[in-house]
From Swiss-Prot:
Subunit: Monomer. Binds 30S ribosomal subunits, but not 50S ribosomal subunits or 70S ribosomes.
Domain of life: Bacteria
Major subcellular site: cytoplasm
NCBIfam families: rbfA
Key words, A-Z: Cytoplasm, Ribosome biogenesis
GO MF annotations in UniProt: ribosomal small subunit binding
Gene Ontology process terms (BP): maturation of SSU-rRNA
One GO term describing the cellular component: cytosol
Intracellular or extracellular location(s): Cytoplasm
InterPro entries noted in UniProt: KH_dom-like_a/b, RbfA, RbfA_dom_sf, Ribosome-bd_factorA_CS
Role according to the record: One of several proteins that assist in the late maturation steps of the functional core of the 30S ribosomal subunit. Associates with free 30S ribosomal subunits (but not with 30S subunits that are part of 70S ribosomes or polysomes). Required for efficient processing of 16S rRNA. May interact with the 5'-terminal helix region of 16S rRNA.
Protein name: Ribosome-binding factor A
Family: Belongs to the RbfA family.
Species assigned in the record: Lactococcus lactis subsp. lactis (strain IL1403) (Streptococcus lactis)
Amino acid sequence: MGNSFRSDRVAVEIQREINDILRNKVRDPRVQDVNITDVQLTGDLSQATVYYSLLSNLASDNEKAATALKKATGLFKSELAKRMTIFKIPDLTFAKDESVEYGSKIDELLRGLNNKSEY
C-alpha cells in the first residue's frame, strides 16, 4: 500500500518534469504539439509508461512524434536524473493516449444527438 502512494507521487513528478523538458530542452519540431497526459509506474519504479496526446489527428504526425519521443528517451532519462532525487530513473516507454480522441468522439456524438432532438 505504501508503494502505491510513492509510485503515484513519483509518476506525477515524472509527468511534470517530462512536460517541462519537452517545452524547454527538446528542440525537435515533431514533438512541438505533444502533451504528456499521464505516467503509469510499476510497483518497483523500474518501468514507466508515459502517455501523450497530440493536437494533430494526422497519422503521419503521430508516427513522427512517436519516433521523436523514442529518440529523445536518453535525454529525458538524463534530465530526470539531474532533476529528481530517486535512486534509479525508470525505463521510459511512450504510448499514445487514445482517451483524448475517444472523449472528443463521444462529445461530438452527443452534440449530434442534441442537434437532432432540437428539430
